[in-house]
Each structure stands twice: as C-alpha cells, then as structure tokens.
Amino acid sequence: MKIKFVDLFAGIGGIRIGFERAAKRFELETECVLSSEIDKKACETYALNFKEEPQGDIHEITSFPEFDFLLAGFPCQPFSYAGKQQGFGDTRGTLFFEVERVLRDNRPKAFLLENVRGLVTHDKGRTLKTIISKLEELGYGVSYLLLNSSTFGVPQNRVRIYILGILGSKPKLTLTSNVGAADSHKYKNEQISLFDESYATVKDILEDSPSEKYRCSDEFIGQLSKVVGNNFELLHGYRLIDYRGGNSIHSWELGIKGDCTKEEIEFLNQLIANRRKKIYGTHQDGKALTLEQIRTFYNHDQLEVIIKSLLQKGYLREEENKFNPVCGNMSFEVFKFLDPDSISITLTSSDAHKLGVVQNNVPRRITPRECARLQGFPDDFILHSNDNFAYKQLGNSVTVKVVEKVIEDLFQNNVNELFGQMKLANVV
C-alpha cells in the first residue's frame, strides 16, 4: 500500500522525514503529492533534500491531488512563549483555518498537526478547545500529546503539542503526554528516557573537529577568562545575561564596559538580587533604589564612590536620586554555554546561532550540523549553505525522532481504522 500525503507549512521537511521513517518501519510506501512552504530559503533546503520545490502561500493553493494523510506544523509564533501571545488575532493565527479548509475539502483519512506548548494554555485553553472542536465538526476523532524531545533520545528540552486525527475514529495511542524534566539540571539528575536507548546528552551530538570559524573570538575568550581563568569548562551550563538567577555571568564580571573592582561586582550582584523584593515595590523588573534603600543590604563605607564609578562606566544609571543597573540581554557571540552532560535549551530561530559549548577547553558556538542533530536530523540531511539561514531553519523545525515515534504509535494502534483489513508488517 502506498500512503499519499500532503506536507503543509513544510519548513525544511522535518515532519516529512519522521513520517516517512515511521511508514518504512511497517514496510509502507509513501508519496508526497504536494508540499507547501512560504519561506523561500526553507524551500531551497527542502528542494535539496527531497528533489521537489514546495508550492508557496497556502492561501493560493485551491486544489489538491487525492491524498490520505495531512502533515502540518502550522507556524509557531502566534502561540509561542518566546514571542507575543497574539493567537487568532494575528494573521498567522488564522492559518489553522487553512488547515481546516484543506481537511474539509479533501477528507483525508488522518492528520498530524504540530505546534508549540503554548497552544495548550493560550487564552486559558480556549484556543486549543476551538481547534479540537473545529476538527471534530469535520468528522475527525482527535487526540493530542504534549511531549518533550529530551525523552526521545534527543538532547534538547523542547516541549511541543502533537494533534492527531482519524476520520470517523478517535486515535488510540499508547504514548501519553510527558513534558519531561523542567530544565537541564533536573534532566541531569533524573536521566529520563521513554525508550530502550540510554538518555542522550549534548556531548553525544558534538562534532569531533568543527571548523575554526565557530571558535569564539580572542576578545570574547579574554573577557570570559576574567571570570573563569583558563579553565573554560567552568562555563558549562552558564548563561550570559544581566539578570539575577543562578548560573549567570554578567557584563560587569566580564568587564564589557570597563573593568570592575571586586567591590563593584559584589555591589551590582547584590543590587540585582535585592531590587525586586516586595519591600521596594512590585515593579516586575525591579525598582530603582535610593541610597538609603541600598544600604539596607550593602552598607559599604565606600558605597558612594562605588556608585559614582559604576555610573561613569555605564553599568548603573541614576533616576531622580535612585539607582538602577543597566540591564538587558548582551550582544555576545554566545548567550548560553550548554552543559555537555545534560540537554540543550530549546532551539529557536532567533538564537540558535548563539548557543555555545566548551570542547577540549575551547569556547565555541555550536555548529549548524550540531543544531540539526539536536533536532534529530540524519547527518546526510543537506543543510543550507548559508549558516544564518541554516540556524534559523533548524530553530523553526520539529524534532524528527518525536514525529517518527508518534506516527509509529498511531499506525501500531489504529491499523483497521487507517488501513482496513490490510496486514501491516512489524506490528507488535
């Protein structure tokens, strides 16, 4: 039997690869009869790997060949925690209704939709309920799973929702929602894996001999050495950001705007740790504090000299006789050094190029190939030749391994509903 499928919002083809792998396990042939992707650079990568050019804007595709299965990772931005939660009010938010149109007009047997975890809680859950209701109105039974890539042998903390539907039947699944460890520290302790494979870590995806172009600059390495000396492996798991919180390195510790004394560093660290306390107000990012308020937690006899110096260097600003650190995300080559013995934070299109690792005591950025491995792409997958586009595309993509396992589970437990009396190979 040949399964004909449509690949909408195809990106670089991550969902397709997972789907085709799952079908192959059951010795099922597949044929993509239509793919659609609006991003031209993503289309270039898709064409390199699948030898076909996706069609463009879904709004302009009015007719489809006959097909059995719809794949659609409709765009994340409207529902993502990483961006503004605009939802259906945003133009991109209405793209779900294009999915609805395709299902209504073509009535395929089944579908897989993928989206960000924010879809579950968006608008207090009403957005997801709306989506499921619309799908059920079309005659589809619907199930969904909230899954973390890190529990599928892929060392990335990436929680996504997978919505599955079968025409006339609610999908039966053995997989259950599992969001995995909340962060890399808990993952390191819990070592979660849903399958027989041992749990994966960042060191498993590192290239042996990455190009020198990914090595951090001498200037940046020099700044880092002010904090860790020559033992750069101490950077494992650290982020570079001017906010409070564990495992953070700040601009004043690196001397970005000028070297700071130990007292100045201690003062700024105390200031960001204390300024959000309720006794000083409820402003989310911390209130500017008076000299008197500062003395309640940092009563140094040279406090005024320290403050004057930090004002001159630009680490501190004065607002009506109150003081606040000049905070923000720093435009460094790397904003987070991954712990090789744990998992990566979630790859995103905007900052995949700024994730780093220390390998053989050398700080560097992770490579596009390593990003691809964090998404479960095979090493023979051809990446875009421009690194900037490759990082963006991989940050926007899906984790291939999760799609593969979800589709395997769907096929395994819904043979009659999907394939009638046909006997599938390798069904347990």
UniProtKB/Swiss-Prot annotation:
The record's annotation in InterPro entries points to: C5-MTase, C5_DNA_meth_AS, C5_MeTfrase, C5_meth_CS, SAM-dependent_MTases_sf
Residue ranges of the SAM-dependent MTase C5-type domain? 3-417
Q: Which PANTHER family match?
A: TRNA (CYTOSINE(38)-C(5))-METHYLTRANSFERASE
Q: Which reaction does it catalyse?
A: a 2'-deoxycytidine in DNA + S-adenosyl-L-methionine = a 5-methyl-2'-deoxycytidine in DNA + S-adenosyl-L-homocysteine + H(+)
Domain of life of the source: Bacteria
* Keyword DNA-binding included in the entry's annotation: yes
In Swiss-Prot or TrEMBL terms, this protein is called Type II methyltransferase M.BanI
The keyword DNA-binding belongs to this UniProt entry's keyword annotation: yes
Query: Which NCBIfam families does the UniProt entry name for this protein?
Result: dcm
State the organism of origin: Aneurinibacillus aneurinilyticus
